From Swiss-Prot:
Pfam families: Cpn10. It is found in: Cytoplasm. One of its GO terms (cellular component) is cytoplasm. One of its GO terms (biological process) is chaperone cofactor-dependent protein refolding. GO terms for molecular function: ATP binding; metal ion binding; protein folding chaperone; protein-folding chaperone binding; unfolded protein binding. Together with the chaperonin GroEL, plays an essential role in assisting protein folding. The GroEL-GroES system forms a nano-cage that allows encapsulation of the non-native substrate proteins and provides a physical environment optimized to promote and accelerate protein folding. GroES binds to the apical surface of the GroEL ring, thereby capping the opening of the GroEL channel. Heptamer of 7 subunits arranged in a ring. Interacts with the chaperonin GroEL. This is Co-chaperonin GroES. NCBIfam families: PRK00364.2-2, PRK00364.2-3, PRK00364.2-4, PRK00364.2-5. Keywords: Chaperone, Cytoplasm.
C-alpha cells in the first residue's frame, strides 16, 4: 500500500462513462480526464516554518473534486492511483 508524505493524499479516480447518453462508445482519446475520486490515504499534513504541523482538511473515504491536471499517476497491481497535494483538491462531494 502507498503512504503519502506531508500534505499529499492518494486518490482512486472515479471511472468515466464509456458511452454517451445517445449510445456512442467513446475512444480513450475522446474521453475527458476524470477529476473526481475517493481519497484512500492521507499524509500527516503540511509543516509550517515554525515546525508545527497543519492537519489535513480531508479524510480517507472522502469523495473529492481535484484540479484537472494535478498530481502524479502511480500503478500498483491492476489499480491506478493519483498522488496530489492537498491544495489541488477543490471540493469535497457531500452526498
Amino acid at each position: 500500500m502507498l503512504k503519502p508524505l506531508g500534505n499529499r493524499v492518494i486518490i482512486q479516480k472515479s471511472e468515466q462513462e464509456q458511452t454517451t447518453k445517445s449510445g456512442i462508445v467513446l475512444t480513450d482519446s475522446a474521453k475527458e480526464k476524470s477529476n473526481e475520486g475517493t481519497i484512500i490515504a492521507v499524509g500527516a499534513g503540511r509543516i509550517l516554518k515554525d515546525g508545527s504541523r497543519v492537519a489535513p482538511e480531508v479524510n480517507e473515504g472522502d469523495k473529492v473534486v481535484f484540479q484537472q491536471y494535478a498530481g502524479t499517476e502511480v500503478k500498483r497491481g491492476d489499480e491506478t492511483y493519483l498522488i496530489v497535494n492537498e491544495e489541488d483538491i477543490l471540493a469535497i462531494i457531500e452526498s
